[in-house]
Amino acid sequence: MATKFPKFSQGLAQDPTTRRIWFGIATAHDFESHDGMTEENLYQKIFASHFGQLAIIFLWTSGNLFHVAWQGNFERWVADPLHVRPIAHAIWDPHFGQPAVEAFTRGGASGPVNISYSGVYQWWYTIGMRSNTDLYIGALFLLITASMTLFAGWLHLQPQFKPSLSWFKNAESRLNHHLSGLFGVSSLAWTGHLIHVAIPESRGQHVRWDNFLNVLPHPAGLSPFFTGNWAAYAQNPDSTSHIFSTSQGAGTAILTFLGGFHPQTQSLWLTDIAHHHLAIAVLFIVAGHMYRTNFGIGHSMREILEAQRPPGGRLGAGHSGLYDTVNNSLHFQLGLALASLGVITSVVAQHMYSLSPYAFLAQDFTTQAALYTHHQYIAGFIMTGAFAHGAIFFIRDYDPELNKDNVLARMLEHKEAIISHLSWASLFLGFHTLGLYVHNDVMQAFGTPEKQILIEPVFAQWIQASHGKSLYGFDVLLSSSSSFAASASDSIWLPGWLDAINSNSNSLFLTIGPGDFLVHHAIALGLHTTTLILVKGALDARGSKLMPDKKDFGYSFPCDGPGRGGTCDISAWDAFYLAVFWMLNTIGWVTFYWHWKHLTLWQGNVAQFDESSTYLMGWLRDYLWLNSSQLINGYNPFGMNSLSVWAWMFLFGHLIWATGFMFLISWRGYWQELIETLAWAHERTPLANLVRWKDKPVALSIVQARVVGLAHFSVGYVFTYAAFLIASTSGKFG
C-alpha cells in the first residue's frame, strides 16, 4: 500500500478527512513536530536546506543575467543610460493584438518587451559590466555556483558528511567563521573587485581576465601599502567634471573620503564605496578573531554573558543563563536573525534612494520608487516573523529554571507595564494624529483653510540643520562654518557632503513641514500599534490571567471550546495574524508618504504635497485618486496603451484583496455546511460522480481559514500598490 501524505506524521496520514491534506501542508516545515525527529537530525535537515536556498537564489540571479543578455538591450543602454529604457525580457503572449504589440515594443526592441524597474542595469554598469558577454559569463558562473551549492546540500545529508550536534552548538567557531569568513573576506573580495575592475572601468580602462594581472589599479602599485604611505591611494581623485566610464576628468585615487555624489551620475563616488568596504573588511576580519576556540585565547560567549550582572543587585541576574537559552533554541536564534535582517532591509530601502550607490539610479525615478517600496514591504514581513519565532521560543524552548531572575524572566514578570505603556503610546498617537487631520479636514470643508492646525517639525529640522542643511537658518554644528564639527572635517568629506545635502536635485534630507510632521506621527502610530500586538503576543504566549495554561495549547489554537469563554483569538499565532494587518497598514502609509513626496519633488511641484498632505481628503484626492485615474481608465472600448497591463493588475489586485474578506469574516460552520452540500450535489451529478475521493470533506479550521484570508489580503494589497506605483510613476516620467 502506498504511504499517504504526509510521511512525516503517521497520525495525520491516517486521518480519514481532508484535514490530512491541510494540516500536512501547514506542518510540513515544522520539523520539530515530525515523527521520530531528533535534535541532531533537526539541525542537519535545516543546515542542508540552507544550501538548497542558496541554489535557488543563484539560479534566480543567473536567470536575471541570462535573460537580459539574451533579450535585453544592455549594450545600447550602456551607450546612453539616461535616454534608453532598460529591457528586462521579451514578452511572448498569444493574446496580444496589434495595439498591444505596438504599445509594448519599446527600448529599441523588435517586439513586445518588459521594461526593467529593478535597478540591475545600473548595478551591473556600476560594477564594471559593459557587454552582453559579461552578462552571459556572470550567468554561467552563477549557474555553476548553484550546482555546487545543490551538491553541497545533498552531500551534507549523507551519513558520513552530516555534522554532529556538538558542531552546530559550537557558537564561538561559528561566530569567528561567519564574521571573518563570510562578512570579512567577502567584503575584502568585493573591495578587490571594485579596485581592480569597477573603478578602472569607470575611468574608461577595460580590465578583464586577459589583462587583469598586467594592469595596475594604482600607478604606484603596492609600494605605498608596504611603506606605510597609505595616503597616496587617496590623492588625485576623480574631478567633479569626470564623465563616468571615460578617462575625461578621471583621477588615479582608489580609496577616498570625498563625501557627497558624483555630479554626473548622482551616485556615491566609487572610490568612497571601495574605501567603505575595505574598512568593513578589516573590522570584521578582526572581529572574527575575538572568540576563544582552538588556542585558549579570546572571549568565551558564556563568560561574557554570565559577567553581565547589573551592580547593586536590584536589577536581577542580568544575562545569566542566556548562553544556553539562546544556543539551545533555534527559534530564539531565528528571531534574532530575522529582527536584524528586517532592520537592515529597511535601512537598505532608505539608503538606496538617499545615498544612491549605483550610477544613474537617481535619475530613474520608477526604479527608485520600486526599490524603496519592495525593500520596505519585505522588511515588514521579516520583522513580524521575528516576533512570531520569539513567541514560539517562549512556548516551546523557554526554561523558567534556567532563566531565574535574568532579563528574559524580568521581561515576563513586568509584561503588564510594557504592554500598557505601548497601549498608551498607541492611543496617544492615534487620537492626536487623527484629531489633527480631521480638524484640518473640517476647516478645509468649511472654507477656512487658514484655521488648520499646522505644526512645524522644529526638532527634526534642527537635526537636519545639525547635519549641514542650511535652509532653516538654525546655524548649528555642520550648518555653522565656525563650529568645531565643521572645521574638523572641512578638508576631507565635508565639502562634498554639504553640496549634496543642500542640493535640490537629490533625496538627501528632504525639506520638511507640517504635512511631514503629521504623516510622521501617523507612521509612528502604525509602528507602535504593530509592536504592541506583536510584543503582547510574545509576552502572553506562555499564559495570561485569562488563560494561565496557554503554553500547553501550543502556538496556534482557535479556542479552548465553549466551556472557557473568551479563549478565542488569544493564541500567539492570532497576535501575529492581527499584527500583519497593522504592519501592511503602516508600510502603506510609509510608501504613500515616500512616493507622493518624491512625485512632487521630481515634478518640481512640492507645493502640492505641502498644501494637500495636512488633511485626509488631500491624501485621498491629490495622491490616491489623482495618480490612479490613468489606471481606473486603463483600457476601454477605444483602445489600450503600455499602462494597460498595470491597470489590469490594479484591478485583479483589488479582487484578490477582496477575496481575503470572504475567509476573514465567515467562519467554520458556514464552510462546513457549504462543503457538505457541494459533496452531496457532486455525488449525484452524472459524469462528476465518476470522480470519487476517500477523504471525508471537512472545512478548514478557524486558524487555517484565517491564514487563507491573510494570504489573499496581503498578496492583493501588495499587487494593487505595486501596479499603482509603477504605472503612476512610469506614466509621468517614462
Curated annotation (Swiss-Prot):
Keywords linked to the UniProt accession: 4Fe-4S, Chlorophyll, Chloroplast, Chromophore, Electron transport, Iron, Iron-sulfur, Magnesium, Membrane, Metal-binding, Oxidoreductase, Photosynthesis, Photosystem I, Plastid, Thylakoid, Transmembrane, Transmembrane helix, Transport
Protein name in UniProt: Photosystem I P700 chlorophyll a apoprotein A2
GO MF annotation, one: oxidoreductase activity
Amino-acid positions noted as binding phylloquinone in the UniProt annotation, renumbered to this chain: 671
Subcellular location: Plastid, Chloroplast thylakoid membrane
Family: Belongs to the PsaA/PsaB family.
Annotated function: PsaA and PsaB bind P700, the primary electron donor of photosystem I (PSI), as well as the electron acceptors A0, A1 and FX. PSI is a plastocyanin-ferredoxin oxidoreductase, converting photonic excitation into a charge separation, which transfers an electron from the donor P700 chlorophyll pair to the spectroscopically characterized acceptors A0, A1, FX, FA and FB in turn. Oxidized P700 is reduced on the lumenal side of the thylakoid membrane by plastocyanin.
Positions annotated to bind chlorophyll a B3: 662, 670
Entries under SUPFAM superfamilies matching the protein: Photosystem I subunits PsaA/PsaB
Gene Ontology annotations of biological process type: photosynthesis
Catalytic activity: reduced [plastocyanin] + hnu + oxidized [2Fe-2S]-[ferredoxin] = oxidized [plastocyanin] + reduced [2Fe-2S]-[ferredoxin]
Native organism taxonomy: Eukaryota, Viridiplantae, Streptophyta, Mesostigmatophyceae, Mesostigmatales
UniProt remark on cofactor binding: P700 is a chlorophyll a/chlorophyll a' dimer, A0 is one or more chlorophyll a, A1 is one or both phylloquinones and FX is a shared 4Fe-4S iron-sulfur center.
Binding-site residues for chlorophyll a B1, renumbered to this chain: 654
Annotated positions binding [4Fe-4S] cluster: 559, 568
Transmembrane segments: 46-69, 135-158, 175-199, 273-291, 330-353, 369-395, 417-439, 517-535, 575-596, 643-665, 707-727
Keyword Membrane: yes
GO annotation, cellular component aspect: chloroplast thylakoid membrane; photosystem I
Key word Glycoprotein present: no
Coiled coil spans: none
Domain of life: Eukaryota
Disulfide bridge positions per record: none
